[in-house]
Amino acid sequence: MSITIQNLNKHFGNFHALKNINLNVPTGKLVSLLGPSGCGKTTLLRIIAGLENADGGKILFDGQDVTAKHVRERKVGFVFQHYALFRHMNVFDNVAFGLTVLPKSERPSKGQIRAKVEELLKLVQLSHLAKSYPHQLSGGQRQRIALARALAVEPKLLLLDEPFGALDAKVRKELRTWLRDIHHNLGVTSILVTHDQEEALEVSDEIVVMNHGKIEQTGSAEAIYRKPENAFVTEFLGETDAFEGRIEKGFWHYNGFAWKLDAQYKWQEQTATGYIRPHEWQIAAEHETPMICAEIEKVHAVGALTHILVKHGKQDVHITLAGSDAARYPIAEGKELNLIPKQVYVFSQNELIEYSI
């Protein structure tokens, strides 16, 4: 089922929570709403579900206007951060619950319900826990059961509101991979709310980055990461260091270093800030003009990566090198490094003001 949102607005008193939201979610895709707390992502999810009413705009499911339809008529499945399993029911009965309370005309037979629950427990790899109760399960197992319960009624749309937020990092990572596989197998249109950049980048077909009730950028995980459209998206999608330079004659200049800008944009001569991610630095060759010359303050090797903190004037700059690259150079505290970037994301001062976090 495809989702189309047109000019959606929502106020809470004087607070404008959603501002003219326009969004298309293609059939069968897993789309993440990504942004900081208070950006409007959960409000948007609740309006799509029918749990909250919009002040203006439309919501279309497969081209049909459902803006005024009750949540029960939207055929939506939910998975929340807090599993909301029934403590007095075992795993089997929790998964079966949605089927047992359907109107009699729509309710499957007991045999069909049993077959469906067994199928779903096999899908989430927890068949052996059918007779267990929620308090006997780990957090990851409870969340798998919550997803199985949501899928039991065969929703046309699956909504997930920070489903892994209450779990520890290792379990979250395992469940992200598992969710991606489940979605690939079932193909149900899904919308995931998260503030976790890594989670969104790992599981999503498309990402919708939100801030202050607006959509900042929509695209594939790779496009969002590789081609951020503004300073907010650049900063929000991972660690960066910022350098204030100047645009002149199609180049961004900083400290004698020049970075050629994309010719398709008409860059005006102005002050502009360049953002560089830790892994997008490299050590300058002898014939290259470095962007910065900095003293190493700390070195920390983690597996195949070497994390380096350098001091550039009063600014701390974070560098991440592959272990093989770091081994070719005298990387040690107190040594100096000449560094050039492999990629610089440049934004004007006006953009920085408009998209400040």
Curated annotation (Swiss-Prot):
- InterPro entries in the record, alphabetically? AAA+_ATPase, ABC_SmlMolc_Importer, ABC_transporter-like_ATP-bd, ABC_transporter-like_CS, CysA_C, Mo/tungstate-bd_C_term_dom, P-loop_NTPase, Sulph_transpt1
Single GO term (MF): ABC-type sulfate transporter activity
Looking up Pfam families in the UniProt record yields: ABC_tran, CysA_C_terminal
Cross-referenced SMART domains: AAA
Task: Tell me what reaction this enzyme catalyses.
Answer: sulfate(out) + ATP + H2O = sulfate(in) + ADP + phosphate + H(+); thiosulfate(out) + ATP + H2O = thiosulfate(in) + ADP + phosphate + H(+)
Give coiled-coil spans as residue ranges: none
* Classification via Gene3D superfamilies: P-loop containing nucleotide triphosphate hydrolases
Kindly list the cysteine pairs connected by disulfide bridges: none
What does the similarity note say? Belongs to the ABC transporter superfamily. Sulfate/tungstate importer (TC 3.A.1.6) family.
What role is this protein assigned?
Answer: Part of the ABC transporter complex CysAWTP involved in sulfate/thiosulfate import. Responsible for energy coupling to the transport system.
Q: What is this protein called?
A: Sulfate/thiosulfate import ATP-binding protein CysA
**Organism for this UniProt entry:** Neisseria meningitidis serogroup A / serotype 4A (strain DSM 15465 / Z2491)
UniProt lists the gene as cysA
